[in-house]
From Swiss-Prot:
Organism of provenance: Homo sapiens
Domain spans labelled DED: 2-80, 100-177
Modified residues (N6-acetyllysine): K224
UniProt tissue specificity: Isoform 1, isoform 5 and isoform 7 are expressed in a wide variety of tissues. Highest expression in peripheral blood leukocytes, spleen, thymus and liver. Barely detectable in brain, testis and skeletal muscle.
Protein name stated in the entry: Caspase-8
Modification Phosphoserine occurs at: S188, S211, S387
Subunit-level organization: Heterotetramer that consists of two anti-parallel arranged heterodimers, each one formed by a 18 kDa (p18) and a 10 kDa (p10) subunit. Component of the death-induced signaling complex (DISC) composed of cell surface receptor FAS/CD95 or TNFRSF1A, adapter protein FADD and the CASP8 protease; recruitment of CASP8 to the complex is required for processing of CASP8 into the p18 and p10 subunits. Component of the AIM2 PANoptosome complex, a multiprotein complex that drives inflammatory cell death (PANoptosis). Interacts with CFLAR and PEA15. Interacts with TNFAIP8L2. Interacts with CASP8AP2. (Microbial infection) Interacts with human cytomegalovirus/HHV-5 protein vICA/UL36; this interaction inhibits CASP8 activation.
Pfam family, one: Peptidase_C14
Length: 479
């Protein structure tokens, strides 16, 4: 069943109370003023899509919403996710996208009876005028009104506690549990990065193009270095797709997609480079999407306890946010990287998971000074286009993704030389790893080298962009 049909079917089965709950739990992403026009679940889904909180390749927020409002039937039927899976997922720190504060308020609203709701309104008359507390207001509406008046917030729970104590002391336990959780979380986040062995920090996804101020705020977590002593350091998968005859035959929109001539040069460069850096190379050529998932599943289930790192390189065609298998089927990049979260691959928890992706993803040019492209008209260079704000890696520590290009811009492949990105990456790794440079320093140099190349025919340029949630410096010793 396709993505839109799934959302439609889910929306049709959510009543007005469900919608009110979903809107409340989404307040940190869609402000109350912008929620006012939302009259049904489909409109809410549309707003979430606009905020990039709901995508075909990333249903985690929708799953969490349905789990929180206890619509487990929809979770199982349409999203193929069981309650136990969600419980395990949300127990991993940093994975929950709905704040503990908002979940706490929602839990209170679920425990308050109609008579207690009337008492709630009566006891708040000093803080909120009676005309605002009309008969139709539910407790979630009251919480929103309290937040507007700044008498309720993550650090403002006194009035709520006073009212709950008068109405039903069991409600206080929900608040106390939240406060205890907040204290534990605060104290744990003040600890050393070494205290987290399985990606358990609350971490944001960063890119090298983030502002200096944002990077400075994270710099302390990079002061230490990931352990890199095992030999081999880890597995290095190289999924190298060249022959797209199946795609041309089976997928009408890809009838003119070209074979990726020259990709063997990239695969060879990656093999030589990472062998020198003591990785065990695992090559896989001309893989369908199903085969790619099967390969990743094999390495997800492997025991990496004696390894210090994992690398996966994918060389293929693609489109916005996805890569193509040789059969023309699509694999969302986020789904590929997410195969190696701490929950799915515990033996890699706390260890760096590195992905390098060279994939043709469109036909737009980044304007600059004027090489040719491996599109239908040009036989030489491949064009990569990424979707704006597309999510590529999990919101979990220890991931790094090197994409060949920034959003909405092409990348280039020369059949006689390989791609600008992979060739520059391998050259920089071979030159700078023996000096002890860390991977972000190296990728910054790759950005510089690639950005100085010109596509003179199309006036195009290319700028790679890494995205990462690394907690420490990542160095690949050559000795």
């Amino acid at each position: 069943m396709d993505f839109s049909r799934n959302l439609y079917d889910i929306g049709e089965q959510l009543d007005s109370e469900d919608l009110a709950s979903l809107k409340f739990l989404s307040l940190d992403y869609i402000p109350q003023r912008k929620q006012e026009p939302i009259k049904d679940a489909l409109m809410l889904f549309q707003r979430l899509q606009e905020k990039r909180m709901l995508e075909e390749s990333n249903l985690s927020f929708l799953k969490e919403l349905l789990f929180r409002i206890n619509r487990l039937d929809l979770l199982i039927t349409y999203l193929n996710t069981r309650k136990e899976e969600m419980e395990r997922e949300l127990q991993t720190p940093g994975r929950a996208q709905i704040s503990a504060y908002r979940v706490m308020l929602y839990q209170i609203s679920e425990e308050v009876s109609r008579s207690e709701l009337r008492s709630f309104k009566f006891l708040l008359q000093e803080e909120i005028s009676k005309c605002k507390l009309d008969d139709d207001m539910n407790l979630l509406d009251i919480f929103i009104e309290m937040e507007k008046r700044v008498i309720l917030g993550e650090g403002k729970l006194d009035i709520l506690k006073r009212v709950c104590a008068q109405i039903n002391k069991s409600l206080l336990k929900i608040i106390n549990d939240y406060e205890e959780f907040s204290k534990e979380r605060s104290s744990s986040l003040e600890g050393s990065p070494d205290e987290f062995s399985n990606g358990e920090e609350l971490c944001g996804v960063m890119t090298i193009s983030d502002s200096p101020r944002e990077q400075d705020s994270e710099s302390q977590t990079l002061d230490k270095v990931y352990q890199m002593k095992s030999k081999p350091r880890g597995y290095c998968l190289i999924i190298n797709n060249h022959n797209f005859a199946k795609a041309r035959e089976k997928v009408p929109k890809l009838h003119s997609i070209r074979d990726r001539n020259g990709t063997h040069l990239d695969a060879g460069a990656l093999t030589t480079t990472f062998e020198e850096l003591h990785f065990e190379i695992k090559p896989h050529d001309d893989c369908t999407v199903e085969q790619i998932y099967e390969i990743l599943k094999i390495y997800q289930l492997m025991d990496h306890s004696n390894m210090d790192c994992f690398i996966c390189c994918i060389l293929s065609h693609g489109d916005k946010g996805i890569i193509y298998g040789t059969d023309g089927q699509e694999a969302p990049i986020y789904e590929l990287t997410s195969q190696f979260t701490g929950l799915k691959c515990p033996s890699l928890a706390g260890k760096p998971k590195v992905f390098f992706i060279q994939a043709c993803q469109g036909d737009n040019y980044q304007k600059g000074i004027p090489v040719e492209t491996d599109s239908e008209e040009q036989p030489y260079l491949e064009m990569d286009l990424s979707s704006p704000q597309t999510r590529y890696i999990p919101d979990e520590a220890d991931f790094l993704l090197g994409m060949a290009t920034v959003n909405n811009c092409v990348s280039y492949r020369n059949p006689a030389e390989g791609t600008w990105y992979i060739q520059s990456l391998c050259q920089s790794l071979r030159e700078r790893c023996p000096r002890g440079d860390d991977i972000l320093t190296i990728l910054t140099e790759v950005n510089y080298e690639v950005s100085n190349k010109d596509d003179k025919k199309n006036m195009g340029k290319q700028m790679p962009q890494p995205t990462f949630t690394l907690r420490k410096k990542l160095v690949f010793p050559s000795d």
